[in-house]
């Protein structure tokens, strides 16, 4: 380079032609026409070979003029061919092409426009307008196009003749070298043609905002509205609708009226504004009609447009020259390079290659235009012209320019869309109707229809119209992963939140009172006194939570919503100084509260607002579908008994004296049978139906002593119990025992040996767990916080009622099997049925009307001792010996109690046998037991708390159904006192009646559960308030039968551990929660771009060449500076993906397996890890290898399939969602996490991290998209919730890319913030550009940064996913019609519990599967 910034060849050129600058006849300042490229190439090959190749001798230093000749030749040739082809393309319509030879010297360029603002003449009393002008200054953008040519050393030697030896081979090689050089030169120079097109197309794309952004903005600005929050929100809403409506609009409309395509193109055209040069006419169609712009797209879209709209013309008249902007140009070299003196390339080559130094004259160029020949020159070219509305536009496809170049066509690219749909949601009762309009009553148990049950599968179509499905089993890789079952890290983070201290902890949530040495009645009175004297009612949090409706719970005003962060844990406030057990009945915290978590062992512990009573009953019907249900006769008889306010107290006395002992029952069976017969005849009820042991003994032993019809009802109860037991086996996969637990014990809570029945009369459960499950830490405490002593010896001859004895008299085994089982009286199935009766069947029948009570056995035995009996056996047959004879009805005697109870069939023999047996095995006290244990091994992960669960049990207690408050002859509280063991048996009336003399409960709220804290706390019970309140609520409402509720409770007792979920989901049982399924698909789309005419000023500088030696070869670089300036007073171009080219992904049902995609966490037991591995991967050790070290499952890439047939496999990810989530939330675009996170329309123009965090996580404010609630899924939308922990990349668990983790972009705050900033910047900058044309910015009216994402990944920038066409029952597809074409024609969406969701995505109407099947 010389000092002037020129190359050596240019410097030599100035020296060689120095005398040209002094010529008296300078070249005229006019533009030159051009010729077709084919003629130029012909001239190059046919006429100029010798002269052309001789020029290369300059590189050997023979003649410096050869270098100048070569530079001039290359520059002239390249000018001609580049611009001639560019002017023939439709892109030239959008450009003002100007030659500016001095562009390489100009670093900055400024263009100023003066725009006259329109005026309107005003009428009287109005201020008239005055002329005003807007001065617009714009800077140009400058770049340089470069292409290279290389000539190797051997070729140079051949061309210069140095390597010629006179042989024919040498001459042939030289000819080949010449031909190869000509081909290389052609390719090199042709690259400028393609480069010009690529450069201009890139400029137009950068200045063309997507139509979904531009159209709403233009509409808003047309109304001259301020860009306040409301206006931005309206624009944002319109943008979302525009994306759904206009994306792939040609596919949507091509099946209908072609005019629909015209309307889509018209929308694209109308959202742009004319340029300031619009008055100039450079390109015209037939009849001199100006061409308004150009549509640039792909060949496929061009064909559709021309076919649908019909060609208006196939030729256009375009400029044959380019404008001129020159600073100086008086020498021949500059003139030649500018093209001022060139009519065609043939003449240029002929003259350039024949001139000698100093003898160049103007006469050598006969086609030089003379003065006055400045009129614009035009030429006719082939161009497709169509009429869209009132506009004549050219349709251009430029794919041929990019063919085999390795550069992708800019108007064909990928579009990523994220779809979502629900799995397992349960519709409200009012929405469950039949297609024909007939409603099937829920109580019609005989009508077994699977469509009544909660859905467990979702069907949809893939890209090839194949029906696919996703079931709960598909989600095992997510819901059975350890990361979904840990909470310790979440607790640490949540405890730091300020709102933790905003509300005091509820003592009944966590207080476990120490059992004193006092009798149980006195301890119960102490507890009731503490409750009654509390300043504020000590409601457990669970009561306040579960009495809310779903809408109330999800409201931003719910103070408990922030604690509901995990479906498998109860998070509660607890005192930091908590002592367990506590000396106080209600622990009064002194230090600030913190948070703790307790595992929900079963899905029935999920709060009612998130797992409704209606859903539980429906799932119960699923369990009962193949099982036994109580007949109407049995249900009526039981209901008669449970609702009888005069149920004989004598029956409670008899039941207490027998205390579940089978030997006593057999000895007293005559009296029991007489009581049953009497009550059946007098009231039509079933006596002793409140006791499992009595029902079993009656069924097995009294078939010949009791009325046949009556006995059949007892047998029916037992059959239902066995059927409920069989339901557990039906939904449990077969398998070996795991850590001493059978698969059923790991799957169902009532099968768990650590869970005891609430009423015990023997020590069978205690004997089985003693020393058998060391890892479970099973402990039992009774009075004095001591462990009870199990006695298997004979009963003591006399009970000591005055001393508190903690010995549990089990007695010696009386069967061979019992002796073989270590002393147990019954097998384990007896205990299981016992638990099913007390935890499922009886609560469903009782509806909260029962209460567990302790027995004052001393008073009971004193009562039966008052029985008047014959003095000897000979008098038993005498009429006066009848216990109900008037002579025997002494006041306060047992005879009078039987008589007043209506027991008319009792005889003396039965009474004698009963009293004699009862005296042999007397019980001193009812002992309350508090059983503590850890969860089974299937729950254990390193991130789960080791909670000690506690359940209350009454040893030798009973269940009272109705307190005889209307019987004035008896004070039942002398014999029985309320001692609730759990919420199923805590009837308020009975509690008040039995303790009325000791404590006044009149001020205690009716809904406050009075379960004493010395029997456990709500947060530590295995069965919690949701199950209690469901039972009372559903039965009281009458919307479900008692049988459905009983099975519903059984369904709610299935566990939530990874092992249990494996059984349930593989067996087809609804797990008690729903899922939000998200999938991201990729589509290859053809875009269409519209640019107004003359919307860009395009400057071309003089080309230069540089040569250099490199590695024994010659490198020749050709440069040409370019610059461009936007000529618009608004956005003059817009674009939109118009046609779906290819579906890249398969749109299938492949499910994410977090064991392969995430850090897998740890199980505490190797056996559990192996079981999960074998069940989830079907023993495919390559997919999830056995863990070593034994507690961890390390990440390894999953095996790849041998091939792909339907495209790249899309991945479905799962978010656990409440079953009561609003189904309508999934009818339209929404955020999969359940709460909107789009803050682009906040009062602050630039969203900050705080504003994004508040929108995402502050649930004390309503959801911006759904203001009626704070969230639709608290388990995913809240900070540190399960969904946040699983898919928030900031937590460090995501190790896959965004594409394979479609939820990552919705769950990660940093990504959400970036997208919100991008969207806010789009709105702000676009609105500023549209509303104002003043300024001095380089990129004015250029599409804002990020606008491309509107059409490449709209889900990320809007933070919304789209619903797809799916249904929970594939039969619903049979009557489905596309709502776009079947509005009002009866498009059905519901059938009982099943539902269909319409496609509300941009693909609606694009794929065949979205239309009518």
Swiss-Prot record:
The keyword Repressor does not apply. One of its GO terms (molecular function) is structural molecule activity. Homomultimer. Makes the hexons and eleven out of twelve pentons. Interacts with triplex proteins 1/TRX1 and 2/TRX2; adjacent capsomers are linked together in groups of three by triplexes, heterotrimeric complexes composed of one molecule of TRX1 and two molecules of TRX2. Interacts with scaffold protein; this interaction allows efficient MCP transport to the host nucleus. Interacts with capsid vertex component 2/CVC2. Interacts with the small capsomere-interacting protein/SCP. It comes from the Viruses. SUPFAM superfamilies: Major capsid protein VP5. Self-assembles to form an icosahedral capsid with a T=16 symmetry, about 200 nm in diameter, and consisting of 150 hexons and 12 pentons (total of 162 capsomers). Hexons form the edges and faces of the capsid and are each composed of six MCP molecules. In contrast, one penton is found at each of the 12 vertices. Eleven of the pentons are MCP pentamers, while the last vertex is occupied by the portal complex. Its main location: virion. It comes from Psittacid herpesvirus 1 (isolate Amazon parrot/-/97-0001/1997). It is found in: Virion; Host nucleus. Belongs to the herpesviridae major capsid protein family. InterPro entries: Herpes_MCP, Herpes_MCP_upper_sf. The gene is MCP. Keywords: Capsid protein, Host nucleus, T=16 icosahedral capsid protein, Virion. Pfam families: Herpes_MCP. This is Major capsid protein. The keyword Protein biosynthesis does not apply. One of its GO terms (cellular component) is T=16 icosahedral viral capsid.
């Amino acid at each position: 380079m010389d000092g002037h910034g020129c190359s050596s060849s240019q410097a030599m050129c100035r020296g060689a032609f120095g005398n040209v600058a002094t010529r008296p006849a300078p070249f005229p300042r006019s533009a030159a026409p051009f010729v077709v490229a084919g003629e130029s190439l012909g001239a190059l090959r046919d006429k100029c070979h010798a002269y052309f190749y001789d020029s290369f001798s300059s590189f050997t230093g023979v003649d410096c003029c050869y270098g100048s000749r070569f530079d001039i030749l290359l520059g002239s040739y390249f000018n001609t061919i580049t611009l001639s082809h560019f002017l023939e393309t439709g892109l030239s319509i959008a450009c003002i092409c100007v030659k500016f030879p001095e562009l390489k010297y100009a670093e900055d360029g400024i263009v100023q426009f003066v725009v006259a603002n329109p005026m309107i003449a005003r009428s009287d009393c109005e201020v008239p307008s005055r002329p005003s002008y807007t001065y617009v200054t714009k800077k140009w953008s400058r770049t340089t196009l470069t292409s290279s040519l290389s000539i190797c050393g051997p070729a140079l030697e051949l061309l210069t003749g140095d390597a010629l030896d006179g042989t024919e081979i040498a001459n042939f090689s030289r000819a080949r070298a010449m031909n190869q050089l000509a081909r290389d030169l052609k390719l090199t120079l042709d690259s400028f043609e393609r480069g010009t097109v690529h450069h201009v197309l890139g400029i137009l794309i950068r200045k063309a905002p997507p139509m979904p952004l531009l159209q709403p903005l233009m509409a808003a600005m047309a109304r001259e509205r301020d860009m306040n929050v409301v206006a931005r929100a309206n624009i944002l809403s319109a943008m979302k609708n525009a994306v759904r409506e206009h994306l792939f609009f040609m596919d949507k409309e091509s099946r209908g009226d072609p005019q629909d395509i015209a309307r889509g193109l018209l929308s694209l055209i109308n959202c742009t504004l004319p340029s300031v040069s619009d008055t100039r006419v450079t390109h015209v169609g037939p009849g001199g009609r100006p061409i308004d712009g150009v549509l640039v797209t792909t060949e496929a879209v061009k064909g559709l447009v021309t076919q649908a709209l019909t060609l208006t013309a196939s030729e256009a008249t375009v400029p044959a020259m380019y404008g001129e902007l020159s600073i100086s140009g008086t020498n021949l070299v500059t003139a030649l390079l500018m093209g001022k003196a060139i009519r065609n390339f043939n003449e240029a080559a002929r003259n350039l290659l024949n001139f000698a130094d100093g003898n160049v004259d103007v006469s050598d160029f006969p086609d030089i235009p003379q003065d006055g020949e400045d009129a614009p020159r035009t030429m006719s070219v082939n161009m497709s012209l169509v009429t869209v509305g009132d506009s004549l536009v050219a349709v251009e496809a430029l794919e041929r320019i990019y063919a085999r170049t390795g550069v992708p066509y800019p108007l064909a690219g990928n579009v990523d869309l994220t779809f979502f749909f629900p799995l397992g949601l349960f519709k409200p009762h009012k929405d469950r109707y039949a297609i024909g309009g007939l409603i099937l009553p829920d109580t019609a148990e005989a009508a077994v229809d699977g469509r009544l049950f909660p859905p467990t599968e979702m069907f949809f179509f893939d890209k090839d119209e194949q029906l696919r499905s996703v079931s709960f089993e598909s989600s095992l890789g997510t819901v059975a992963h350890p990361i979904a079952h840990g909470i310790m890290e979440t607790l640490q983070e949540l405890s730091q939140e300020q709102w933790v201290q905003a509300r005091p902890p509820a003592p009944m949530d966590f207080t476990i009172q120490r059992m004193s040495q006092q009798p149980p009645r006195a301890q119960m009175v102490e507890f009731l006194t503490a409750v009654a004297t509390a300043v504020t009612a000590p409601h457990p949090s669970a009561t306040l939570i579960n009495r809310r409706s779903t809408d109330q719970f999800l409201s931003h005003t719910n103070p408990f919503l922030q604690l509901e962060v995990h479906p498998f844990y109860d998070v509660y406030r607890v005192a930091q100084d908590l002592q367990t057990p506590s000396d106080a009945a209600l622990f009064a915290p002194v230090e600030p509260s913190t948070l703790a978590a307790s595992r929900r062992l079963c899905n029935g512990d999920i709060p009612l607002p998130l797992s409704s009573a209606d859903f539980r009953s429906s799932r119960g019907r699923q369990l009962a579908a193949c099982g036994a249900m109580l007949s109407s006769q049995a249900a009526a008889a039981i209901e008669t008994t449970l609702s009888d306010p005069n149920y004989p107290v004598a029956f409670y006395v008899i039941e207490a004296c027998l205390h579940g002992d089978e030997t006593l029952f057999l000895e007293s069976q005559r009296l029991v049978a007489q009581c049953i017969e009497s009550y059946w005849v007098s009231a039509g009820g079933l006596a002793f139906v409140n006791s499992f042991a009595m029902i079993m003994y009656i069924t097995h032993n009294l078939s010949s002593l009791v009325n046949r019809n009556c006995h059949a009802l007892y047998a029916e109860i037992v059959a239902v119990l066995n059927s409920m037991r069989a339901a557990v086996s039906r939904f449990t996969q077969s398998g070996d025992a795991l850590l001493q637990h059978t698969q059923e014990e790991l799957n169902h809570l009532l099968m768990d040996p650590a869970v005891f029945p609430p009423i015990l009369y023997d020590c069978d459960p205690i004997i089985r767990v003693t020393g058998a499950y060391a890892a479970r830490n099973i402990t039992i405490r009774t009075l004095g916080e001591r462990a009870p002593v199990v006695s298997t010896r004979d009963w003591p001859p006399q009970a000591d009622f005055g001393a508190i004895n903690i010995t549990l008299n089990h007695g010696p085994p009386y069967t061979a099997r019992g002796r073989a089982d270590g002393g147990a009286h019954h097998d384990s199935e007896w205990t299981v049925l016992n638990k099913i009766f007390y935890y499922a069947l009886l609560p469903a029948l009782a509806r909260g009307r029962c209460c567990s009570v302790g027995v004052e056995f001393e008073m009971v035995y004193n009562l039966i001792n008052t029985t008047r009996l014959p003095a000897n056996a000979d008098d038993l047959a005498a009429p006066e010996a009848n216990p109900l004879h008037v002579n025997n009805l002494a006041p306060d005697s047992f005879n009078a109690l039987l008589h007043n109870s209506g027991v008319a069939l009792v005889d003396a023999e039965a009474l004698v046998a009963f009293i004699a047996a009862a005296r042999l095995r007397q019980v001193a006290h009812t002992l309350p037991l508090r059983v503590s244990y850890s969860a089974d091994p299937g729950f254990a992960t390193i991130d789960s708390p080791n909670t000690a669960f506690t359940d209350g049990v009454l040893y030798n207690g009973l269940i009272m159904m109705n307190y005889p408050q209307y019987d004035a002859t008896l004070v039942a509280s002398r014999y029985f006192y309320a001692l609730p063991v759990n919420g199923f048996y805590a009837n308020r009336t009975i509690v008040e009646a039995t303790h009325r003399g000791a404590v006044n409960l009149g001020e205690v709220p009716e809904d406050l559960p009075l379960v004493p804290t010395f029997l456990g706390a709500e947060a530590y019970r295995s069965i919690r308030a949701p199950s209690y309140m469901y039972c009372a609520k559903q039965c009281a409402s009458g919307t479900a039968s008692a049988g459905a509720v009983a099975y519903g409770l059984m369904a709610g007792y299935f566990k939530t551990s990874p092992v249990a979920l494996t059984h349930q989901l593989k067996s087809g049982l609804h797990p008690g929660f729903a899922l939000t399924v998200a999938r991201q698909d990729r589509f290859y789309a053809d875009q269409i771009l519209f640019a107004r005419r003359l919307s860009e000023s395009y400057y071309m500088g003089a080309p230069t060449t540089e040569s250099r030696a490199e590695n024994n070869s010659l490198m020749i670089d050709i440069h040409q500076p370019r610059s461009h300036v936007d000529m618009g007073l608004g956005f003059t171009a817009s674009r939109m993906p118009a046609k779906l080219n290819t579906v890249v992904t398969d749109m299938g049902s492949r499910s994410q397996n977090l064991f392969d995609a995430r850090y897998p966490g740890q199980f505490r037991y190797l056996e559990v890890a192996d079981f999960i591995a074998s069940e989830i991967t079907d023993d495919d050790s390559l997919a999830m290898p056995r863990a070593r070290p034994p507690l961890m499952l390390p990440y390894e890439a999953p095996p790849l399939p041998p091939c792909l047939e339907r495209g790249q496999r899309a991945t479905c990810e799962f978010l656990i969602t409440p079953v009561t989530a609003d189904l309508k939330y999934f009818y339209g675009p929404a955020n999969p996490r359940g709460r909107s996170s789009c803050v682009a329309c906040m009062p602050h123009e630039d969203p900050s991290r705080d504003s994004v965090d508040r929108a995402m996580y502050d649930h004390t404010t309503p959801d911006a998209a759904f203001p009626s609630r704070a969230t639709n899924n608290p388990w995913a939308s809240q900070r540190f919730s399960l969904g946040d922990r699983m898919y928030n990349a900031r937590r460090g668990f995501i190790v896959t890319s965004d594409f394979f983790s479609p939820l990552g972009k919705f769950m990660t705050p940093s990504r959400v913030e970036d997208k919100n900033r991008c969207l806010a910047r789009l709105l702000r900058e676009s609105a500023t550009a549209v509303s104002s044309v003043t300024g001095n910015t380089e990129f004015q009216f250029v599409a804002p940064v990020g606008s491309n994402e509107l059409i490449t990944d709209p889900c990320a920038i809007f933070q919304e996913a789209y619903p797809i066409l799916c249904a929970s029952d594939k039969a619903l597809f049979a009557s489905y019609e596309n709502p776009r074409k079947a509005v009002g024609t009866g498009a059905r969406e519901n059938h009982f519990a099943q539902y269909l969701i319409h496609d509300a995505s941009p693909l609606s109407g694009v794929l065949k599967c979205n239309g009518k099947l």
